[in-house]
Amino acid sequence: MQTRLTLLVLVAIGALTINARPAAAQQTLNFSLGYFTVRGEDARVEGDVLNANRGIFVFDIDDFNGATVGGEWLVPLGEYFEAGAGVSFSRRTVPSVFADFVDVDGSEIEQDFRLRLLPIAFTVRVLPLRQTSPVQPYFGGGLALIAWRYSESGDFVDFQRQNAIFPGRFVASGTEPGPVLLGGIRFAGDSVSGGFEVRYLSGDAGLDRPFSILEANPRIDLGGWTYAGTFGWRFGR
């Protein structure tokens, strides 16, 4: 389903730009819509709270994968380079239950885990075929400031009070720097552009002790891959 949707997006982008004239070097206001996948269980930072929680709760790491949207301002630096500044947003709420405990009435002990990411990225791209080509493959990288928020809310078990069940809500947030790598292809006309991009983001942040009874210094891995279709409005000379 995801592959079919990606093909449809690329066909639509090609239809919009195939008859356009090759573009001179221009600024671009770029918009993206795609799918963000968090780093897998074996690739996550040591002490990651999601990996630790899987020993107690029932959920999968890839339950945190989901849609992402973004916007970016791109400025040419000569014919072969381009600088960008942009922001993207993703949020995912994952329902869970305790794996080995139930309430006194036999019902599940339920909670929600929520991860929100808002990376602000500053990047530089290399365009081997130049800005004036109607087909523009590119690659590059840069630095992102990742504004994040992670929360756990619902019912929990107090293992120090004879497994008493209590309602709780734990929230942490902050901003962490991290590297970003990207690559893609763009079909460029005089006034519009479109394409497809793959982006990798890396970063992690520390959490307080209440977020994990299994880790003395729990962390949250903020990294992952983004696969997105892009559409841009080109202006200026």
Model-predicted segments: where are they?
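A charged, solvent-exposed segment within the mature domains of Sec-exported extracytoplasmic proteins
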Residues: P128, S133-S193
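C-terminal segment of classical bacterial N-terminal signal peptides
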Residues: G14-P22
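Gram-negative (and chloroplast) outer-membrane scaffold detector with strong preference
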Residues: Q26-T28, Y35-T37, E72-V157, G224-R237
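Short glycine/proline- and aromatic-enriched beta-strand/turn motifs that initiate or cap beta-hairpins
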Residues: A23-V75, G232-R237
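Predominantly the C-terminal beta-signal and adjacent terminal strand-loop region
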Residues: R44, R92, L181, R186-R237
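Flexible, solvent-exposed loop segments that connect beta-strands
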Residues: E41-D60, R91-L115, A147-T175, A205-D221
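Transmembrane beta-barrel architecture of outer-membrane proteins
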Residues: F64-T68, L117-A121, E176-V180, S193, ...
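Bacterial N-terminal signal peptides that target proteins for export
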Residues: M1-V9, I18-N19
